Design a protein with these regions (language model features):
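Non-catalytic macromolecular-recognition regions in eukaryotic signaling proteins
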Residues: 4-179
Length: 179
């Protein structure tokens, strides 16, 4: 609902942009200390790697439309196989950010993917000396961006009158859902 002054100008109310906007879709981070910054070897320190996924955009992402792979190291060094680190899916559907009835922004879903798959643990094997490993999450997902603009279509697009309801020429504002 919007209110108008006597002049007909809007004085607040509903947002004029149909989208929240932004430049992010799914944000991807490791949970704190996951993987841990340091472990002891010889199977004496088991651990998981937890990837946090948050939908910062305006499109819903189904569980089956997102795959997470853990890469950057040989899983055999931690008692696992490459299959234990491939094509993991999040626990939940990633619902988008939305605008509430009062105009407030409702945050999108945050969900998690745990490695290795199947609820098991990484168990560091025996290493010679200190060894650094790179853990990286590669995430592939289907996403969409929508846009909207108002066009001006008149009965006579050649002989445009000064008092026409709209102007078909010139630049138009394009609204985008971002990402």
């Amino acid at each position: 609902v919007s209110a108008c002054k006597k002049s007909g100008a809007a004085t607040g109310g509903a947002p004029r942009d149909p989208f929240l906007g932004g430049t992010s879709g799914i944000t991807i981070n490791f949970e704190k200390d996951s993987p841990p910054p340091e472990v002891t070897d010889d199977k004496s320190f088991s651990f998981n790697v937890i990837v946090r996924l948050k939908n910062e955009g305006e499109a819903k992402v189904e569980r089956n439309d997102i795959k997470v792979n853990l890469v950057g190291f040989d899983p055999n060094d931690f008692g696992k196989t490459f299959e234990d680190l491939r094509d993991a899916q999040p626990e939940d559907i990633l619902e988008p950010r939305t605008r509430g009835a009062e105009g407030d922004v409702q945050e999108g879903t945050t969900t998690f993917v745990t490695f290795p798959k199947g609820g098991d643990f990484f168990e560091p094997q025996k290493f010679i000396g200190n060894t650094e490993f790179t853990f990286r999450a590669d995430v592939c997902y289907h996403y969409k961006t929508r846009s909207q603009t108002q066009l001006c279509v008149l009965r006579d697009m050649i002989n445009i009158k000064d008092n026409s309801i709209c102007q078909p020429t010139g630049s138009k504002t394009v609204h985008s859902s971002g990402a």
